[in-house]
Protein backbone atom coordinates (compact mmCIF):
# COMPACT_ATOMS: atom_id res chain seq x y z
CA UNK A 1 0.00 0.00 0.00
CA UNK A 2 2.83 2.41 0.83
CA UNK A 3 4.35 1.87 -2.60
CA UNK A 4 1.10 2.93 -4.29
CA UNK A 5 0.92 6.03 -2.10
CA UNK A 6 4.52 6.90 -3.00
CA UNK A 7 3.77 6.44 -6.71
CA UNK A 8 0.78 8.75 -6.39
CA UNK A 9 2.85 11.37 -4.54
CA UNK A 10 5.51 11.13 -7.26
CA UNK A 11 2.87 12.14 -9.82
CA UNK A 12 1.95 8.86 -11.47
CA UNK A 13 -1.72 8.73 -12.38
CA UNK A 14 -1.84 5.62 -14.62
CA UNK A 15 -0.29 2.19 -14.04
CA UNK A 16 -0.16 -0.97 -16.11
CA UNK A 17 -0.61 -4.07 -13.98
CA UNK A 18 -0.30 -7.02 -16.39
CA UNK A 19 3.16 -8.46 -15.82
CA UNK A 20 4.87 -11.67 -14.78
CA UNK A 21 4.32 -10.83 -11.09
CA UNK A 22 0.57 -10.16 -11.38
CA UNK A 23 -0.34 -13.41 -9.63
CA UNK A 24 2.52 -13.63 -7.14
CA UNK A 25 0.16 -13.00 -4.20
CA UNK A 26 -2.80 -14.87 -5.65
CA UNK A 27 -6.27 -13.44 -6.11
CA UNK A 28 -6.04 -11.60 -2.81
CA UNK A 29 -2.96 -9.69 -3.93
CA UNK A 30 -4.40 -8.86 -7.32
CA UNK A 31 -7.66 -7.63 -5.85
CA UNK A 32 -5.83 -5.65 -3.15
CA UNK A 33 -3.70 -3.92 -5.78
CA UNK A 34 -6.78 -2.94 -7.77
CA UNK A 35 -8.60 -1.68 -4.65
CA UNK A 36 -5.62 0.38 -3.46
CA UNK A 37 -5.13 1.94 -6.89
CA UNK A 38 -8.86 2.71 -7.09
CA UNK A 39 -8.81 4.29 -3.61
CA UNK A 40 -5.95 6.56 -4.71
CA UNK A 41 -7.70 7.36 -8.01
CA UNK A 42 -4.79 5.93 -10.00
CA UNK A 43 -6.10 4.65 -13.31
CA UNK A 44 -4.89 1.16 -14.14
CA UNK A 45 -5.14 -1.47 -16.83
CA UNK A 46 -4.05 -5.04 -17.39
CA UNK A 47 -5.58 -6.88 -14.41
CA UNK A 48 -9.21 -6.98 -13.35
CA UNK A 49 -11.34 -8.40 -10.56
CA UNK A 50 -13.67 -10.00 -13.11
CA UNK A 51 -14.91 -9.83 -16.68
CA UNK A 52 -17.58 -7.20 -15.94
CA UNK A 53 -14.90 -4.85 -14.58
CA UNK A 54 -12.72 -5.46 -17.65
CA UNK A 55 -15.63 -4.79 -20.02
CA UNK A 56 -16.41 -1.55 -18.17
CA UNK A 57 -12.84 -0.24 -17.97
CA UNK A 58 -11.02 -1.61 -21.04
CA UNK A 59 -9.57 -0.27 -23.19
CA UNK A 60 -8.53 2.68 -21.08
CA UNK A 61 -9.50 5.77 -23.08
CA UNK A 62 -7.81 9.09 -22.31
CA UNK A 63 -8.36 12.50 -23.85
CA UNK A 64 -6.19 15.54 -23.34
CA UNK A 65 -5.80 18.70 -25.40
CA UNK A 66 -8.11 17.28 -28.05
CA UNK A 67 -6.08 14.09 -28.52
CA UNK A 68 -7.85 10.85 -27.73
CA UNK A 69 -5.84 7.68 -27.09
CA UNK A 70 -6.57 4.10 -26.14
CA UNK A 71 -4.21 2.22 -23.84
CA UNK A 72 -3.95 -1.57 -23.91
CA UNK A 73 -1.73 -3.76 -21.70
CA UNK A 74 -0.64 -7.40 -21.92
CA UNK A 75 1.94 -9.76 -20.43
CA UNK A 76 3.71 -12.81 -21.78
CA UNK A 77 3.60 -14.74 -18.49
CA UNK A 78 2.49 -14.95 -14.88
CA UNK A 79 5.50 -17.08 -13.92
CA UNK A 80 3.47 -20.27 -14.15
CA UNK A 81 0.97 -19.11 -11.53
CA UNK A 82 -2.52 -19.53 -12.97
CA UNK A 83 -5.01 -16.69 -12.78
CA UNK A 84 -7.90 -17.80 -10.58
CA UNK A 85 -11.39 -17.10 -11.85
CA UNK A 86 -12.99 -14.61 -11.82
CA UNK A 87 -9.78 -12.52 -11.90
CA UNK A 88 -8.31 -11.56 -15.27
CA UNK A 89 -4.73 -10.88 -16.33
CA UNK A 90 -4.44 -9.71 -19.94
CA UNK A 91 -2.15 -12.16 -21.70
CA UNK A 92 -0.41 -11.68 -25.05
CA UNK A 93 -2.82 -13.52 -27.32
CA UNK A 94 -3.56 -12.37 -30.86
CA UNK A 95 -7.27 -13.23 -30.71
CA UNK A 96 -7.85 -11.16 -27.55
CA UNK A 97 -5.55 -8.37 -28.68
CA UNK A 98 -7.30 -8.04 -32.06
CA UNK A 99 -10.68 -7.84 -30.33
CA UNK A 100 -9.33 -5.15 -28.00
CA UNK A 101 -7.79 -3.15 -30.87
CA UNK A 102 -11.10 -3.26 -32.74
CA UNK A 103 -12.92 -2.18 -29.56
CA UNK A 104 -10.46 0.71 -29.17
CA UNK A 105 -11.13 1.85 -32.74
CA UNK A 106 -14.86 2.05 -31.95
CA UNK A 107 -13.98 4.92 -29.58
CA UNK A 108 -12.65 6.99 -32.52
CA UNK A 109 -9.26 7.36 -30.92
CA UNK A 110 -6.37 9.19 -32.54
CA UNK A 111 -3.79 6.64 -31.38
CA UNK A 112 -3.72 3.15 -29.93
CA UNK A 113 -0.85 2.54 -27.52
CA UNK A 114 -0.08 -1.02 -26.46
CA UNK A 115 2.12 -1.61 -23.40
CA UNK A 116 3.58 -5.11 -23.34
CA UNK A 117 5.46 -7.03 -20.69
CA UNK A 118 7.69 -9.39 -22.66
CA UNK A 119 11.19 -10.48 -23.60
CA UNK A 120 14.07 -12.27 -21.96
CA UNK A 121 15.73 -10.66 -18.97
CA UNK A 122 19.05 -8.90 -19.46
CA UNK A 123 18.85 -8.97 -23.25
CA UNK A 124 19.82 -5.83 -25.15
CA UNK A 125 17.84 -6.76 -28.27
CA UNK A 126 14.31 -8.06 -28.79
CA UNK A 127 13.90 -11.80 -29.11
CA UNK A 128 11.90 -13.67 -31.75
CA UNK A 129 8.75 -13.69 -29.57
CA UNK A 130 8.87 -9.91 -29.08
CA UNK A 131 9.50 -9.31 -32.78
CA UNK A 132 6.68 -11.60 -33.88
CA UNK A 133 4.13 -10.06 -31.53
CA UNK A 134 5.35 -6.50 -31.95
CA UNK A 135 5.12 -6.71 -35.73
CA UNK A 136 1.69 -8.31 -35.38
CA UNK A 137 0.48 -5.45 -33.15
CA UNK A 138 1.73 -2.77 -35.56
CA UNK A 139 0.17 -4.60 -38.53
CA UNK A 140 -3.17 -4.92 -36.76
CA UNK A 141 -3.80 -1.37 -35.61
CA UNK A 142 -1.42 -0.41 -32.81
CA UNK A 143 0.25 2.96 -33.43
CA UNK A 144 2.74 2.76 -30.59
CA UNK A 145 4.04 -0.34 -28.82
CA UNK A 146 6.03 0.07 -25.61
CA UNK A 147 7.64 -3.01 -24.12
CA UNK A 148 9.24 -3.77 -20.82
CA UNK A 149 10.61 -6.64 -18.72
CA UNK A 150 14.16 -7.33 -19.97
CA UNK A 151 15.69 -4.90 -17.42
CA UNK A 152 17.56 -3.34 -20.33
CA UNK A 153 16.68 -0.60 -22.75
CA UNK A 154 16.24 -2.17 -26.17
CA UNK A 155 16.08 -0.38 -29.54
CA UNK A 156 13.31 1.99 -30.52
CA UNK A 157 12.16 1.81 -34.13
CA UNK A 158 10.19 4.41 -36.09
CA UNK A 159 8.09 3.27 -39.03
CA UNK A 160 6.64 5.60 -41.62
CA UNK A 161 4.71 5.00 -44.81
CA UNK A 162 2.44 7.23 -46.88
CA UNK A 163 -0.42 6.84 -44.41
CA UNK A 164 0.99 6.21 -40.96
CA UNK A 165 3.78 6.78 -38.51
CA UNK A 166 4.33 4.07 -35.92
CA UNK A 167 6.78 3.52 -33.09
CA UNK A 168 7.90 0.42 -31.27
CA UNK A 169 10.08 0.64 -28.17
CA UNK A 170 11.05 -2.98 -27.66
CA UNK A 171 11.91 -2.44 -23.98
CA UNK A 172 12.24 0.70 -21.88
Spans of features found by a protein language model:
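Acidic, metal/ion-coordinating pockets
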Residues: 1-172
